[in-house]
């Protein structure tokens, strides 16, 4: 942020927290589904499975996790992807997302226990992950693939950087 302010001679600048929030929820959901597949041979009452199902995902994380999100999905200005009610107050979103993930866990476990091959399981996981993406997009808005960044510098000169991607902006 400070480097952006300096490089572009801005008065102030904020990166979108909602953009990182979206991809954090998506990646945590993906990780959860991978863990469900990896533990499908264990009973629901096993400590690991019970722990996973208790809270499939939640807010927060560690620095290395957010750096990985930046590297994979990039960043965008807050003006391009602003906060929403769901990103500012995530309790309700987390409640629904965790319910959806638990349902998805049951679907995957049932599929695996029915003898489905790994290709069918992977395909189903991708379909479930697409549903999660759709849920997040409806709740938070669709993250931009490309955007224009317009700003006024400290000298009040107007600038536009066109055709940026979140990765190129990072």
Language-model segments: what does each one mean?
Residues 2-170:
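Catalytic-core signature of thiol
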């Amino acid at each position: 942020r400070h480097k952006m302010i300096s490089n572009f001679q801005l008065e102030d600048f904020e990166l979108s927290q909602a953009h990182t929030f979206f991809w954090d929820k998506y990646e945590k959901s993906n990780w959860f589904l991978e863990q469900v597949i990896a533990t499908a041979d264990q009973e629901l009452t096993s400590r690991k499975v019970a722990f996973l199902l208790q809270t499939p995902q939640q807010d927060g994380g560690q620095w290395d996790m957010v750096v990985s999100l930046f590297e994979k999905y990039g960043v965008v200005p807050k003006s391009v992807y602003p906060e929403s009610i769901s990103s500012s107050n995530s309790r309700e979103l987390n409640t629904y997302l965790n319910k959806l993930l638990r349902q998805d866990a049951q679907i995957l476990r049932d599929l695996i226990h029915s003898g489905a091959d790994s290709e069918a399981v992977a395909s189903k996981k991708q379909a479930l992950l697409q549903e999660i993406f759709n849920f997040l997009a409806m709740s938070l808005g669709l993250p931009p693939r490309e955007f224009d960044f317009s700003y006024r510098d400290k000298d009040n000169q107007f600038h536009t950087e066109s055709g940026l991607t979140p990765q190129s902006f990072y």
